[in-house]
Regions:
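N-terminal mature-domain "stem" immediately C-terminal to a signal peptide or N-terminal signal-anchor/transmembrane
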Residues: 1-10, 20, 28
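A cross-kingdom marker for long, charged
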Residues: 173-218
């Protein structure tokens, strides 16, 4: 909770470092379960044995600028550039992940932002963290309820119902989507809407779009 409250005081370029820290503090048991499942599958484990893993490709994401509009790679580039995040500095400053699976999971955080369409707003970060570490688990819902609904009720009680609807939609929208096993590194030039279709993702609801847009760090 300390790191979450500090996020709103950080400069935008420094927030990835804080988010990486939060990712190490939640969902340890579920993280191990997901990791074991990933490594026990020959197809997904092989993704870590490549010369150009997802982490290697993401470390040079500025090359994605040349990709066609609407592709996963171009969407990643535009998202990472939106607040001029220094990706290399954020990773180096954090220093908490090891090579292999852990590095891939670090990059999956940004992939979730892009594929699910969540911004870097307070709500967007909460929804991304919840989706990442408690997919299909009610504890993830409880997390974004705490950081989103409770605070919003204190600031603007009339918006509580909309916030609740958005949180419910986040939970329903991510449940059962096996994004951990999807080879994003092989589909950087594919249209992002096709990827969403392949993952059987529902469209963002109006409630999610509204709350994500209006949920500021101030």
């Amino acid at each position: 909770l300390y790191h979450w409250t500090r996020l709103r005081k950080d400069e935008p370029v420094d927030r990835p470092k804080r988010v990486f820290k939060i990712l190490t503090l939640f969902g340890t048991k579920r993280y191990r379960k997901t990791r074991d499942k990933f490594l026990s599958n020959p197809d997904t484990a092989a993704l870590l044995e490549r010369d150009k893993t997802l982490s290697v490709l993401m470390s040079d994401y500025k090359k994605f600028k040349r990709y066609k509009k609407g592709t996963l790679g171009k969407e990643i580039y535009e998202f990472m550039q939106s607040e001029e995040v220094d990706y290399a500095k954020a990773v180096a400053d954090f220093g908490g992940f090891t090579d292999g699976y852990d590095s891939r999971e670090r990059d999956m955080h940004d992939i979730i932002h892009v594929v699910f369409g969540y911004s870097r707003s307070r709500f967007g970060e909460g929804a991304t963290i919840a989706t990442h570490y408690w997919q299909g688990n009610s504890f993830g819902l409880a997390f974004i309820v705490f950081v989103g609904l409770v605070r919003q009720m204190l600031i603007q009680p009339s918006a509580a119902r909309l916030m609740y609807t958005a949180i419910r939609d986040v939970y329903k929208g991510q449940k059962g989507i096996n994004f951990h096993a999807y080879p994003f590194e092989d589909n950087l030039t594919k249209d992002i809407n096709i990827i969403r279709y392949e993952l059987k993702m529902p469209s963002k609801t109006l409630a999610i779009q509204t709350v994500d847009r209006l949920s500021k760090w101030d």
